[in-house]
Amino acid sequence: LFRSTWKEKVITQLTGGLAGMAKGRKVKVVNGLGKFTGANTLEVEGENGKTVINFDNAIIAAGSRPIELPFIPHEDPRVWDSTDALELKTVPKRLLVMGGGIIGLEMGTVYHALGSEIDVVEMFDQVIPAADKDIVKVFTKRISKKFNLMLETKVTAVEAKEDGIYVSMEGKKAPSEPQRYDAVLVAIGRVPNGKNLDAGK
């Protein structure tokens, strides 16, 4: 079992520093869930009730969240997104990385170094699909020594059982039978949080 107290301490120091800088510059910070209620108003629901903020202009920097697919049991603690993977609570013996992008490969590299057996499934014909094919070709040759790469393959079903996460796939490199994994990292992209703010109002 891994302890994340040091990481949490660093995060607390960084966020505390930012809060201090904001206070020093007389920036008012309102914590809570905000939604636009009009062209020049925002309502924030926090622990102490609702606060209405009036403004002339607004900068939306709401970040993003991982894409979730309906057939994946995301509520199971063995099904991870990138934030879960960074918690490093345990090192799975066998880890499936869904998505051959930067985040998935980076996390796969970390867990391989810690001792995990890594499978990577990517629906396109190369990892990091947006990158230059010549560069990716060299990179793929290198990581193929560490990972079991399944290109032109996609996940069709994910089932959580007591002894593991069972994953069915189809495509060029798909195994004929469902595969059992100790954990599955879903790294298939992210979507912006802007829609949650009712910015259209």
Where are these regions (language model features)?
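Conserved acidic residues
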Residues: 56, 93, 182
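Extended, small-residue-rich solenoid/repeat segments and analogous flexible loops
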Residues: 14, 18-22, 27-33
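Glycine-rich active-site/cofactor-binding loop and its immediate structural neighborhood
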Residues: 38-68, 87
